[in-house]
């Protein structure tokens, strides 16, 4: 979404910046994919045993670990960005734009890692629809907010970064409408 929007801004530097920024977040978040995968497996086992107390504990543990990691990433954002750019060779303009994108999008880490935990938990609870609804909502919000900020307000790279950040938290807010462990207990 971000590349598509900045691709019309008239400079290849914007596309390069989104590519570099996206790559950094793909690496960072891929490392913590265990929050989703590990949570889904253990939750599925506990749910199959009808152990709803363990199901709830698994969700709380996973979210707690995810938030700890997210706040650590926020605290270490400057060294992470500096170290990353010692390995990534770009032009000064692309590095500057990618840094702007990084420093805005890193604030989405609590939402992203929290959603990893919830997605794994929902999949383990045999509910893959809700994570899909969250992903669809995030994409719609990202497109709408990014278009508004970039083309409506002329914010360029900052606009797509804020659009991405807004979409991440919109997905997290959607959790307030989601089934809780008590809802699953009532259905059994």
Task: Describe the role of every protein-language-model region.
Residues 2-6, 18, 43-48, 55, ...:
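Hydrophobic/aromatic residues within transmembrane alpha-helices of membrane transport systems
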Residues 6-26, 93-97, 157-158:
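Interfacial/gating helices of multi-pass transporter permease domains
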Residues 15-75, 112-131:
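Small-residue-rich hydrophobic transmembrane alpha-helices
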Residues 19-22, 66, 105, 109, ...:
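Residue-level recognition of transmembrane alpha-helices
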Residues 72-103:
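Short membrane-interface helical motifs at transmembrane helix boundaries
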Residues 74-82, 143, 147, 172-176:
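Membrane-embedded alpha-helical segments of multi-pass transporters/permeases
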Residues 139-172:
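Membrane-interface helix-loop junctions in multi-pass transport and translocation proteins
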Residues 176-187:
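Single conserved hydrophobic/aromatic residue that forms the stacking wall/gate
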């Amino acid at each position: 979404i971000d590349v598509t929007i900045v691709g019309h801004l008239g400079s290849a530097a914007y596309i390069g910046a989104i590519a570099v920024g996206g790559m950094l977040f793909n690496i960072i978040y891929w490392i913590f994919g265990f929050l989703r995968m590990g949570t889904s497996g253990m939750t599925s086992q506990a749910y199959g045993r009808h152990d709803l107390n363990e199901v709830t504990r698994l969700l709380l543990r996973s979210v707690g670990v995810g938030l700890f990691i997210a706040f650590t990433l926020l605290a270490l954002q400057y060294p992470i960005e500096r170290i990353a750019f010692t390995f990534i060779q770009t032009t000064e303009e692309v590095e500057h734009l990618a840094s702007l994108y990084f420093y805005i999008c890193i604030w989405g880490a609590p939402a992203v890692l929290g959603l990893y935990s919830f997605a794994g938990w929902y999949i383990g609870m045999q509910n893959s629809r809700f994570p899909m609804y969250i992903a669809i909502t995030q994409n719609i919000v990202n497109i709408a907010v990014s278009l508004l900020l970039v083309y409506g307000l002329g914010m360029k790279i900052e606009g797509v970064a804020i659009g991405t950040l807004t979409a991440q938290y919109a997905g997290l807010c959607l959790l307030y409408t989601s089934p809780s462990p008590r809802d699953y207990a009532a259905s059994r």
